[in-house]
Structures are given as C-alpha cells and as structure tokens.
Amino acid sequence: MIFEQLKLNIDVKDSAFNELYPNHIKELAYRHWTPIVVARMAAEYLAEEPNSKVLDIGAGAGKFCLVGAASTKGMFFGVEQRASLTKISKKIADRHKITNVEFIHSNINEISFSDYDAFYFFNSFYENIDTSCLIDDTVLPDRDLYYDYSEYVKGQLDITPVGTRLATYWSKWDEIPSSFDLTGTACNGLLNFWKKIS
C-alpha cells in the first residue's frame, strides 16, 4: 500500500513508512533515516533519466533507496556496511516487489563510483564523531574513519564525469570536491543539490 501510494505521488507519512521496520530500527528513524519528503526531492533530482543508476552512500535501513525506487524510474543501489541492515532492506524490497533497487553489503571504500550515474549522501560517517546515538554496537566508532571515508568519497566523486549529480543531506561538505557546484538547496539548507562542472 505504501509503495503504491509513493508510485502515485500520494503523500505518505514517515511514521507509516517506518512501521515497515522492526522496532529497534524504527526507533532510529528520526535521527538516521532520510525523511520521505527529502528522499523524494533528492531522488527526483538524481534520477533525471529512466534507469539512471543512483548510489546511496551508507544506505542504513534502505529508506532513501526504497522511496526513490518507488517514486522514480531510476535504479537505486544502497551500499551499507552492516549486514543486518542490508538484510532488512532486501526483505522489504522483496516483500513489496520493488525491482529497481539493490542493496549491497560492503564498505564504501570497496565501491567504485564509476559504476553509477548519481549519488546520495546523508552524512553516513558522522556516527564516527558523534557517538550520542549509535545505530548499534557492531561498528566501533573511530574519528579517523570519518576522515578516511570522507576522503575516499571525495576522491571518487572527483573522477566522475562532468554533469554527475550529487544530493547531500545534513552534510558538513567534507566529502564534496571543488569540481562540484552547488545548484540548489531545500529544507532550510539541509538538502543540497550538486553538479560536477569540471
């Protein structure tokens, strides 16, 4: 029902969407999972052509990818280092027959950005700095990882083709190379739209 509503561009409340998740994942939604209104705006910007391959950098419980796949004709890929979250995301996609989404259990530094057309980033590495609301205890926070992962993403984005699109939410912009230009903002400046210009 939720995904049919998203396909028909009917508003869906985050609280209703989050009911798809187990309780311990649902409790993290406010802090860690992209709100539907943000996911829809970002997905529409990123999936500018049918079958555009959009990578969610640090997909968490897969909410951005699931909403984007239901709302656009893009192909969404979510990379996540926690196997448990990847499993939950895949289960929801399978149960609701969402075929234009794929979840990858991997670390971001094992992913080549050249396989994708556009990118979404919701401050995935920040839990290595702010430990006040950890997702779980399977990944130990490490301040150096924040900088290492940000540098990796920056380097990968810098070698993408001119015209590549990027959307960031709650980002400190540490991962944005100077070759990208800010083309728009929404949500009081928290959601930013970028395009590679050089």
Report each predicted region and the residues it spans.
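Conserved SAM-binding loop
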Residues: 89
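Conserved SAM-binding motif I beta-strand of class I
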Residues: 75-80
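Conserved SAM-binding loop of SAM-dependent methyltransferases across substrates and taxa
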Residues: 63-73
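S-adenosyl-L-methionine
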Residues: 1-49
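Conserved SAM-binding strand-loop segment of SAM-dependent methyltransferases
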Residues: 98-106
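Conserved class I S-adenosyl-L-methionine
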Residues: 51-60
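Short conserved loop adjoining the S-adenosyl-L-methionine
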Residues: 110-114
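C-terminal substrate-binding/active-site "lid" region of AdoMet-derived donor-dependent transferases
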Residues: 128-198
